[in-house]
Amino acid sequence: VLGVAALGLCAEDAPRPWPSEWRSGAGWRSATLEPPNRSGATIGFTQLEGTSTGITFTNAISGELSLRHSILNNGSGVAAGDVDGDGWCDLYFCGIGGRNALFRNQGGWRFQDITAQARVECAGQASTGALLADVDGDRDLDLLVTSVGGGARLFLNDGKGRFSEMLDSGLLRKLGAMSMAMADIDGDGDLDLYVANYRTTTIQDEPGTRLVLSNEGGRPVVKTVNGVAVKGSEYEGRFDVGASGEILENGEPDALYRNEGNGRFALLEWTNGLFRDENGRPLDRPPLDWGLSVAFRDLNGDGVPDLYVCNDSDSPDRVWLSDGAGHYQAPDPMAFRCQSLSSMGVDFADLNRDGFDDLIVLDMLARDHRHRNTQLAWTKAPIGSFGTHAARLQLPRNTVFMSRGDGTYAEAAYLTGLPASDWSWTPIFMDVDLDGREDLVISNGFHRDVRDQDRLAEMRKESATQRFAPNQELARRARFPEWMGGMAAFRQGAELRFEDVSMGWGFGTPRIYQGLAAADLDNDGDLDLIANSFGNAPSLFRNNAVIGRLLVRLVGLAPNTEGIGARIGVESEGGRQVQEMMKGGRYLSCDQATRLFGGVGESATVTVKWRTGRRTVVRGVLINRVYEIREAEAQ
């Protein structure tokens, strides 16, 4: 007890080992969960820092580098999963300006840095995203890491938390790779990989760049960059010229890989009929978007993983509906009538319990009056498309899409109270108060508020009378203030209305949080949060819930050993809830593969529809228990 108290934790936070006594049934086993006895505990979270947890990692870059390489300001993520099979969820943090770090969960909210012996430091690269998944189907968690300029890397686990890099994995070791998601796109049983790519560099970081235009075929094109001909150079395909003459810098093509087994992937082509537009025509070139996030999700209820890709800047979001055999087509233009302008992250939940998944996409609209009125915001519509049914506005705010059940969505951000959450990155729908309705938690903040209209006005005024050398131009960017957004929380109440409860739920620390993941770090059956901070050490947020909960984990057939893509339905007197087991899909981050249900009655029925088409039904399910459901006995 003395040891626990010395850490600033309570006795009820002492290590709680994974259950050793299980009840078994046909295709399942279950064990009792022991919610902590926290007298006087309030709903929400308790923030824990490295002084008590042992997580001393810091994700930071120098001020000069943040000015010269603005893409690095997009931060880094975190991946959660049990890498050594001891029953405790471990954590892997990416560092944008230094080493990455793997921390072994010792229980009792204490973590040990095992990066060196695990051999996953990834020194010398600007690491962005991470994902822990069973890539090779041997029932341990392997590691995927992305970086700016370094693409994606794969490290295979030996089952004991020691990793070896797969140097011939087939993954591209270039491009500005960001977030990742995995799913079985072709029904062959293993997990395929999508990597959202941004850029490695941008001309925004190169003041004084000289672009020369010419007219080719009746349209303006960029002919040279700093005297270098675009055609045949690294600049080919990098720029477009808009209808009003503005020069647009393109992002990089994303990468979709087919899992070939044994830790090897094959890069799939965009232009061989794999991807088709709304009219079913094969794409003639890959989209050159500024990719930030990507998630697989069965959007239309046909049992196969569709895709939602969040793109920054002028790039539109991409929605791709799967045929189950690895081919994708854009939905009808009437499906989504608008989009967020600078989309950061996406998450899904059946908010109104009608059996169809709804979704939120995050942008950068401020919650408070002062910030909102200093932001430079605009609504973007494709020039020349006014009056056409295909025109889609790009809105500078969050968008919430409620499924109508027919493949189309109604935008409902203002109806739900969720149009603004600050400079937001990762949304996670989760039932924090365990009342049976998904609440929403969001990571926020940015190193430089480059949309601050007051600073922009000052700089424009100076530029009218002065000339600045490139180094001086970069230095002027230091005037943009930090946006210490911290964490945000919205509680879902009646009639789809969400209330901002950030302060009441323990999210009062001003900080820049970007990558965010959910996991059960103390084995009490609720979901805690892990936030990777920019310029600071990460924060852990212990969930303070004490009421009834139901935790579901899946044991799938190899090679999809975690049952990724399965739909889990829980039906009781509290109603019906449905969730999907996902892998990756967070901004630069990856949750532990587990699903939490609150508001469940004393007895429930759990139905699992596996990606293979099999089905498992477990009746008489009790609350305050964890259920492990096996696909091997499924029908």
Language model features by range: what are they?
Residues A11-A60:
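N-terminal pre-domain segments of enzymes
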Residues A11-E12, G44, S52, S62-L65, ...:
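Gly/Ser/Thr/Pro-enriched helix-cap/hinge segments flanking short amphipathic alpha-helices
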Residues E34-P35, F45-T46, R99-I114, G151-M166, ...:
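Beta-propeller blade repeat segments, especially FG-GAP/WD-type strand-to-loop junctions
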Residues F45, W88-G95, D140-S147, L191-N197, ...:
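Hydrophobic beta-strand segments that make up the repeating blades of beta-propeller
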Residues I55-G77, I96, R119-L131, S169-A181, ...:
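Repeat-based blade/solenoid architectures
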Residues G75-G85, R104, S127-G137, L156, ...:
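Beta-propeller blade termini
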Residues Q117-L131, T146-I185, V195-E236, V241-A243, ...:
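Asp-box/WD-like beta-propeller blade repeats and closely related beta-sheet repeat scaffolds
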Residues Y198-E249, A366-R392, F446-E482:
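Short, conserved, GDST-rich strand-edge loop motifs in beta-rich repeat architectures
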